[in-house]
Amino acid sequence: MQKIILHRAVAAPTGAAGTDRSFSGTTIKLGLDIHQACYVVAAQEDHATPKPARRFAPAEFVPWVGTLLARGHQVFVVYEACGFGFGLCRRLQAAGATCYVIAPRKLDEARKGVKTDALDAGVLCQRLSRYVEGNRKELAVIRVPSEEEERARHVHRQREALVRARTKLQAQGRGLLLTHGQPAPARWWRKQGWAALEARLPGWLCVRLEVFRPVLAVLDAQIAALTAELEKAAAPDLPSGLGKLTQVVISREVCDWQRFQNRRQVSSYTGLCPGEYSSGGKRVPGAVTKHGNPRLRCALVELAWRLVRFQPQYPPVAKRLAVLGQGARATGAARKKAIVAVARQLAVDLWRWQTGQCMAEKLGFQP
């Protein structure tokens, strides 16, 4: 098993082995396996074999990288996207290092069934080395949003979390009503629905439901406030069916439409491209990859269904209207394939529209 060397403090530039003086190469590549309590770091100088992994306290790592940069080393860092966000990447870039955040993936390339933090850091370090040397397929690099973009995303993501919480409490209340043979309206906690229910419910059941009502009322108010804030930020003169809320969610999840070079990159980011199994002369398309942004994918499918109602002349919808127009009467598989195809083409058309390649009317959208 690979030995882990503990690095407990950041030494001064004149320190002994284990500090920046232990490196003699011009280029240093660092693979990070990040945890809340520590960072496990594997380092490689130039083209040499990676050194044994070290552990750093989170507060020690960036200053240590700073000492390497101060000595004239060129430092490259890579770590997988995780729940700790992009703050570390921004701090490293501000210090002068080149930092890449990549999509998570299985790092046990040999499939030995052995997983340690040191091994993961070592694999990341070696992949980074090959990437820096020119093999761009070694890392799936993620675009790091700016702090402003990340703050803007939190608004609709917080609203999404509140909607989920409200749906859960609403369902619990309805379940309690149905369990005891009572009518269960969808908005049972609101003033009008509650007045009708309270008159016919037994007292003990009203007491149980009253526990939910204040929480649901607060959630209603918070969701309404966030919805108004988001709709206020929407672009003016949107085509019919493209709601203000959906437009803001899609724009903020993408952040920058200009980063896509072609329609293939757009489709890949949505995760709505079909998988494929091909060998010899056989080609078998599979289910969509779902590789990409799940919130964007959900918003696109929701918007695609609205276009079936409000923009039936939109070319991707018109092409599949025979299936989509049947609604629930169509088979589940046919409806799903059709709406996914519409959502995929819709993402490409939104990219063309937002990057100024063509007008919305030319794409088939009606005002």
Where are the language model's segments positioned?
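Glycine/alanine-rich phosphate-binding loops at beta-alpha junctions
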Residues: 1-99
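Short alpha-helix plus adjacent loop in nuclease-associated cores
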Residues: 100-141, 282-291
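A short, charged helix-loop
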Residues: 125-154, 192-203
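Short helix-capping/linker segments at secondary-structure and domain boundaries
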Residues: 131-136, 169-170, 255-259, 305-315, ...
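Low-complexity, acidic/Ser/Thr- and charged residue-rich accessory regions of DNA metabolism proteins
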Residues: 281, 321-367
